[in-house]
Amino acid sequence: MIEVLSRCNAIIDEKKLEERLVALEAAKSWSPRVVSRLEMLLRSGTDEALYRINPIQFATEKSIAEAESIDLFLHACVAGLFDMDWQLVCPMCSDVVESFRSLRKLHTHFHCHLCQSDYDAALDDYITVTFTVSPAVRSIRFHKPDALSAWDYVFYYKLTPGGVLPDGVPWSDAAKGLVRVLTRMEPGSAANLEVDAAEGALLGQDFDSDAHFFVPVASGTGVTPSHVPVMLDGGKCVTARANIAPGKVVFEVRNAGKLPVVFGILQLPMATFQRPKLHFTPSLSGKRLLMTQTFRDCFRSEVIGATEGIAVLDVTLVFTDLKGSTALYERIGDLNAYIQVQRHFQHLLDA
């Protein structure tokens, strides 16, 4: 194996990259410079740029037709350049609640720990598809989420930049300004987390479970305790009741559970803080991917039974009568007739 250091200080397997780019070039007839633009991204893109790539955004940035961009990443997956992920994204906070390598592993119901909310997934709502560089071609730090810093884990691994506030700022960027403390805690460990509390409220959050505390902060509430004990244990958070006034306070946090946690304390502007409604930048929905012929050709095992138990919100019903279908089966055989019927429906889908 030949390894080279790229300009962005990334280790690339040059032999595999070249072989797989050749396979991608041969997959179909591409528009000029489409594959070279992808190669440039693979060689010189940052770790963030190669993680959960949105092919619709890539198309816009590189002046490529959306359909060709989707085909590009699908064929790149077949060639082994990228891995494809199906993600359940919370509509309230843009948290990637769950991520799957296969559509078959998706389920209909999901729970967002950050919002304490439950949702039902649909292929055209909450389910998006992204692409991440294969670790066999180039290693990026997001391939090992357990080794990420607490900051990277929350703001790049957990939250997607696709959720945008009414003023156009990504929610993940706005949320960074609320964080006062953010740390990883191993099982059995303890940490004294000091916060300079302001009017509003303090939210303590384990980013992988429902464990949290919510403490209003207001003037005239009495003496603020210098230390507030907090215990995290198996998805639960136990903390002493405290009257918090503006000023410095130390939270004595102990992870009594058996798993590591990423724990943070956020300063909310008011005790009744309501997160603004998000809208999402265009992305590749599960429904659109399933309607893409390249996906149906290259990932046939994913298509079979793909929509079992998964809703589609926007549906058009078409009633079609196949005249003489029984005679067709008898004349040319079951398999050939089945293929003809499938082509009939494919023509309808493509219309």
Where do the protein language model's features map onto the residues?
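Regulatory cytosolic signal-relay segments
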Residues: 243-245, 254-313
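Catalytic NTP-binding/metal-coordinating core of nucleotidyl cyclase/transferase enzymes
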Residues: 302, 306-351
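Key residue(s) within conserved catalytic/signature motifs
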Residues: 199-201, 209-221, 293
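Cys/His-rich short segments
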Residues: 78-147
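Long, charge-rich boundary regions
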Residues: 120-211
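Noncatalytic accessory or regulatory domains flanking protease catalytic cores in secreted, cell-surface
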Residues: 191, 225-248, 254
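N-terminal alpha-helical interaction blocks
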Residues: 2-81
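Noncatalytic modules at the cell exterior or secretory-pathway interfaces
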Residues: 196-206, 242-261
